[in-house]
Amino acid sequence: MKVRVLGILMNEKLSNISKMFDKVLKDCVTSNIKITLYFDHIRIQAMNERITYTDDIFDVNTDISCDQKFSLLVDAGTLISFFKNHNQDIEIEIKNDYSIVFKYDRGSFSSTWIEDKAFPDFFYPVGDGIRVMSSSFIQSMKRSFAFVGSDEFRPAICSILLNVKKDYIDIVSTDMFRLFINRKEYANAVEERSIMLSEVAASILYRFLSDKDTEISISTDGVRTFLCFDNVIISDMNVEQQYPNYEYVCNKFEKSSSVKFDRDLLISVLNSMTLVDNVVNVKVDKENGITVMSEDFGNRKKIMESMPLNALEGPCFNFSIGKENILSSVKSLIKGDTVMDWSDQYKMIKMFNPKYESTYVLNQTLYNL
């Protein structure tokens, strides 16, 4: 059985696999690449405990009839290393004695292949998905994952939620104390659905498409999330449809007061608090504006800074909160004026840029002063 393929194309596909799986534990699955030969193309597949990757190469010549296919496993390291240094036309011959020979103009290289009977099955998208452009969607994902903190709640999540509604998509990320809702207009939804996307799968999209403007199809079968672009299919395994009910939290928020201020000025004030403690006390009133204070009683350290506010609606308010909690929340918002709503009933703050009110952060404060 023979197939002829351009080495530069194989190297491009295999280098993507190398980037995806360079840090995983090697075993009989992750150390092999599955190759399936069809009469008009080659399918290359790899997987680890969470991600599966499928890509096709159509610019090939094979001696397989249109009603046949043949699949085999080849050592990933061997295959990647060979094509990294051979970009010319390569003739691949698969022999019945479990040897595989790569022939090129200056010589040949031989190795071995094994049967794929024990290799896990690959799953493929079923039904329609949502379609987004990578240029805007990937930036939104980056903001969502950069927002969440490394607390004890995060390992249970490590995912963002794509909540697809009739006219928009909410991209939601959370940790123990915060919710970040990034809303995008979307007019092509066939039905409302919830899709989970892991941080692992998202990082693959960053690597592949961060500098491209490519359409991505995203769908789910309820257990896996599928990402499709160009000829690539990425399956994000073990993604169950369970996520904190963020809509309940958002809907119960009742505003008691509201203050408008400059985003960058508050960031500067919060950065000053690093000198003392990780908990800051925030007071808002018309006379003094916004006052941020941090105090370490044991070491007799205290810092306090004030900044003007642009407008205050409702009574003055105060709260305590983790510095990194509020700092990363403010940073996640678009530059310019920022509005902070305070809910006295639930001791929560909601922050957003008034020009983009549908993208906002909800923070649970620690306690009232």
Regions found by a protein language model. Name each.
Residues 156-164:
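A glycine-rich, acidic short-motif signal
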Residues 1-150, 166-369:
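DNA polymerase sliding clamps and clamp-related checkpoint/processivity subunits
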